[in-house]
Amino acid sequence: DSDDERRLSVVLEEDAEVIRYIKPPLNQLGLFYKAAKQYNPDFLVETADKKYMIEVKAANQTDNEDVQEKAKAAIKWCECASQVDADGKTWEYRLVQGDKIVVGNTFKYVIGMAIPVVVDGE
């Protein structure tokens, strides 16, 4: 785990709008990309109105092809999860640049700084 992820954990712990969060165990989500490789996001976060899949990356890694392929697969996973979520909440994916995570900021602020991901055809 990176220091960026540690700082995000602190933000999540301190934000009253965050109901719960987890760092998912390896290979538990069934999230695949590129020739059956498994992707494990850094965090799953629930707020009162939404659920989020969060990936934290260093600024110099956000444009990496592998990171972008994982992001596209995660966006599709979130679209499917939104349709069957038992709580009726929408799932959203966020790619967060590690240097944008500052202890003391809110979770909403952190995800507002997320890197846009373009899915083919959109």
Identify the residue ranges that each predicted region occupies.
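Electrostatic, structured charged patches in enzyme active sites and in nucleic-acid/phosphate-binding
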Residues: 1-122
